[in-house]
A protein has these predicted regions:
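Loop-centered beta-sheet repeat module
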Residues: 98-141
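Short, acidic/polar
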Residues: 26-29, 104-112, 170, 235
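An alpha-helical appendage that flanks or caps ligand/catalytic pockets
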Residues: 58-90, 130-235
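Active-site beta-loop-alpha junctions enriched in small/polar residues
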Residues: 16-18, 46-50, 105-107, 125, ...
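Glycine-enriched alpha-helix->loop->beta-strand junction motifs that scaffold or abut catalytic
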Residues: 5-8, 37-39, 112-121
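Glycine-rich anion/phosphate-binding loops
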Residues: 19-32
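Hydrophobic faces of well-ordered beta-strands that scaffold small-molecule active sites
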Residues: 11-14, 41-45, 100-103, 120-122, ...
Length: 235
């Protein structure tokens, strides 16, 4: 509907993952939407958090994420590629270039973004943290011989206009959601590899119920202070 009802705006998945949606299926769907929109389709992809954890499974590996990006990009752009031992191609595609946006916070994800992606998707509104993320992406792009300024950045955070206290309560779920990614990073990386402003607020987190994922008023957000809401959201 959006592809056929618009003429200039770009369209993007926000975000898919290679675990719950097989890469060739994603590629086929994107190729169709790219054709319908006249070449305005982008891929937004990550490791998969709630989509996997609600099934009791971990997000996909960075290796599988990178492979999925290469497979989806090649197929949508009309190029053949080997995947799981088979040469694949979608000969009917329009052949338009597929911009790829990777969602992630950790050093490895940010380096991957700088190395192979067209854009970084950051679920956060804190300007200082965004600067840190952007520096990681651009340093990686430069190390890969790419122009760092060609890698775009999108900061995705909820916004609320109205009463301040009400706005904080209605957006408090968002830092709690982000906290799931942050806990993964804390468990994976040395403390000095991550900004203190990103990791400190999850230390009092007791757990997360995925049956109430991204839910306004959920007890998942009980550990999130007003100060954290103000940093992560636009209220």
């Amino acid at each position: 509907l959006m592809a056929q009802a618009t003429t200039t705006m770009r369209l993007r998945t926000c975000v898919t993952n290679p675990a719950t949606r097989e890469p060739t299926v994603t590629a086929s769907a994107l190729a169709v939407l790219d054709e319908l929109s006249g070449g305005r389709m982008d891929l937004g992809i990550g490791r998969g958090d709630s989509a996997r954890r609600v099934l009791g499974k971990p997000p996909t590996s960075m290796k599988d994420l990178e492979q999925a990006v290469h497979v989806i990009r090649a197929l949508v752009e009309g190029r053949g590629i080997e995947f799981e031992g088979t040469m694949l191609e979608l000969p009917w595609t329009s052949g338009h270039q597929l911009p790829v946006w990777i969602a992630g916070y950790g050093p490895v994800a940010l380096k991957l973004t700088g190395r192979i992606a067209d854009g970084a998707m950051l679920q956060i509104g804190d300007p200082d943290l965004i600067r840190w993320f952007v520096s990681q992406v651009r340093d990686s792009a430069a190390a890969a011989g790419r122009d760092p300024n060609h890698v775009q950045v999108m900061a995705a955070a909820p916004a609320h206009v109205g009463d301040l206290a009400d706005g904080r309560d209605r957006t408090r779920w968002f830092p709690a959601l982000v906290g799931n990614h942050v806990v993964d990073l804390v468990n994976k990386y040395p403390r000095e590899d991550l900004p203190e402003e990103l990791t400190a607020y999850v230390r009092d987190r007791e757990g997360y119920d995925y049956l109430h994922h991204a839910e306004v008023g959920s007890s998942n957000a009980s550990f999130v202070t007003d100060e954290v809401v103000d940093r992560f959201c636009l209220v």
